[in-house]
Amino acid sequence: MPTIKQLIRNTRQPIRNVTKSPALRGCPQRRGTCTRVYTITPKKPNSALRKVARVRLTSGFEITAYIPGIGHNLQEHSVVLVRGGRVKDLPGVRYHIVRGTLDAVGVKDRQQGRSKYGVKKPK
């Protein structure tokens, strides 16, 4: 506990909140161009080949974004929309690509949770 004299000398510093998705610069989503599309393995105890893309955003940042869903059509120079949201078992992946917008098509034959994967209602 500081004394009154110590508080006069230098005031308390406000706690600065640190953003979990700095590359979005306070925007809900950002547009970007894929520079590389590849797979990486998750950390223990999980095992898989997770699809990710290296994306150069309009804000100037180069980030790694996860491609959700089964199957995708993304390749180099694809224009994608990126939202925040990390992938727990992939260190360094703090963004998701939004399916069903720009060059990222929705997941094929998706019946449930369609809105999260950019799929229209089946007829």
Curated annotation (Swiss-Prot):
Asked whether the keyword RNA-binding is assigned, the reply is yes
Under the heading Pfam families, the entry gives:
Ribosom_S12_S23
Q: Which InterPro entries match?
A: NA-bd_OB-fold (IPR012340), Ribosomal_uS12 (IPR006032), Ribosomal_uS12_bac (IPR005679)
Tell me where in or outside the cell this protein is found. Plastid, Chloroplast
Q: Could you name the domain of life of the organism this protein comes from? A: Eukaryota
Q: Which CDD domains match?
A: Ribosomal_S12
Functional description taken from the UniProt entry? With S4 and S5 plays an important role in translational accuracy. Located at the interface of the 30S and 50S subunits.
Name of protein = Small ribosomal subunit protein uS12cz/uS12cy
Look up and give the organism this protein is from: Arabidopsis thaliana
